[in-house]
Amino acid sequence: MSETASWQPSAPIANLLKRAAIMAEIRRFFADRGVLEVETPTMSQATVTDIHLVPFQTRFVGPGAADGLTLYMMTSPEYHMKRLLAAGSGSIYQLGRSFRNEEAGRHHNPEFTMLEWYRPHYDMYRLMDEVEDLLQQILDCDSSERLSYQQAFLRHLDIDPLSADKAQLREAAAKLDLSNIADTEEDRDTLLQLLFTVGVEPHIGRDKPAFVYHFPASQASLAVISTEDHRVAERFEVYFKGIELANGFHELTDGDEQLKRFEQDNRSREKRGLPQHPIDMNLIDALKHGLPDCSGVALGVDRLVMLALGAEKLSDVIAFPVGRA
């Protein structure tokens, strides 16, 4: 596409028409399966505690908030959707905006479209099957490859991520010319994520989608720990053509355990000099009330559309990315 004036959409109108058709196809996919579409707030008084996520925030100064009320733009609709699940919604999905105050570039935009869905009584493997069904319908791609996080590291880095100590991880990082970052990093999971991003991701999902599952228990986030191997969590990610497309969990239903994880996140934030974030106690209360056993997944729709259209960057499939917003 030739250079356009900044008032014009960065994406060709033809691409936006195809994008609209894909959005309609996604809705048909879930309608055919009896999954309810829901809408949840874009702003909340609480936010994520994950040390790797940076939310936008604003202040509400309307009636009843004379001193101002801090609100956070949602990085994902997960917390509100789980409250619906606890209230008895059954299977649900949402197509909506999420916001992350992070990078903007070829595969990132601070405002993006997220597809998130939850399936009561599904385990991680059954949900992976459904994700694959959706990808094949939208992308007309081959059947996926599936490998564990441990297998991925052993295959591409010749190191066991579940048993390697920090010295061994730094040694592996040195082989990737990452010593300038790894040598001063004390957090084991950050080292693992660095190795995964640089040493594993570029080699998986090149010709067909790749599901990587059983991430380390220390990276469980909102997922349950495997009952078969307590070293790993029931969590998966999906990669295709060098792009991370989705992140899914067999969801943690224990409110007390989830609260402990959030509190640990905030302690980690404090150690790193990051602001501590307000914990969503409405989510904790919903979990304690009773979240059904379920699995859920979040998928980046802009990236999905980019792959479906064979586009090179998100700005080819988004009308007005941040530079033109």
UniProtKB/Swiss-Prot annotation:
Pfam families: tRNA-synt_2
PROSITE patterns per record: AA_TRNA_LIGASE_II
GO molecular function, one term: lysine-tRNA ligase activity
InterPro entries in the cross-refs: Aa-tRNA-synt_II, aa-tRNA-synth_II, aa-tRNA-synth_II/BPL/LPL, EpmA, Lys-tRNA-synth_II_C
Keywords: ATP-binding, Ligase, Nucleotide-binding
GO terms under biological process: lysyl-tRNA aminoacylation
Keyword Cell wall biogenesis/degradation: no
GO annotations of cellular component type: cytosol
EC code(s) of this entry: 6.3.2.-
Binding positions (substrate): 76-78, 118, 251
Binding-site positions, ATP: 100-102, 109, 244-245, 300
Reactions catalysed: D-beta-lysine + L-lysyl-[protein] + ATP = N(6)-((3R)-3,6-diaminohexanoyl)-L-lysyl-[protein] + AMP + diphosphate + H(+)
Function: With EpmB is involved in the beta-lysylation step of the post-translational modification of translation elongation factor P (EF-P). Catalyzes the ATP-dependent activation of (R)-beta-lysine produced by EpmB, forming a lysyl-adenylate, from which the beta-lysyl moiety is then transferred to the epsilon-amino group of a conserved specific lysine residue in EF-P.
Summary of subunit composition and partner proteins: Homodimer.
Entry similarity comment: Belongs to the class-II aminoacyl-tRNA synthetase family. EpmA subfamily.
Stored HAMAP family: EF_P_modif_A
NCBIfam families listed in its UniProt record: genX (TIGR00462), PRK09350.1 (NF006828)
Name by which UniProt lists this protein: Elongation factor P--(R)-beta-lysine ligase
Organism: Yersinia enterocolitica serotype O:8 / biotype 1B (strain NCTC 13174 / 8081)
